[in-house]
Amino acid sequence: MSQLCPCGSAVEYSLCCHPYVSGEKVAPDPEHLMRSRYCAFVMQDADYLIKTWHPSCGATALRAELIAGFAHTEWLGLTVFEHCWQDGGNIGFVSFVARFTEGGKTGAIIERSRFLKENGQWYYIDGTRPQFGRNDPCPCGSGKKFKKCCGQ
């Protein structure tokens, strides 16, 4: 039986993010890398997450922390709401909302992730968490106020 990709693309996992997570292909752009990294969190694949972090970030030191977090977190969904490139296409940004439950509580990560392309491969560098007012429209595009959507 086929399984839809956890990244929210509505495409089968085997045709979507699996080729990147398995190492068969290299993600062609920051959005594909971000979606495949989300899948790696869902599938609890610390190796892929570390491999796709830029080497300067020292992600191998985070292995134990990543693995410990897997046991307590259930990922519920991903919404990408913006992506763009700079510096001749070698720096990319992807803004998203990732919903999860942890310890019985529902939460959301809202982030603008930064990616760098080196030697034909994209790497995750870091992310910023934009601040939204409670009455601002939710960035996920639901049409609801932030406080009634991802800000809960």
From Swiss-Prot:
Coiled coil: none annotated. Pfam families: SEC-C, YchJ_M-like. Gene3D superfamilies: 3.10.450.50. Belongs to the UPF0225 family. This is UPF0225 protein YchJ. It comes from Escherichia coli O6:K15:H31 (strain 536 / UPEC). The lineage of its organism: Bacteria, Pseudomonadati, Pseudomonadota, Gammaproteobacteria, Enterobacterales.
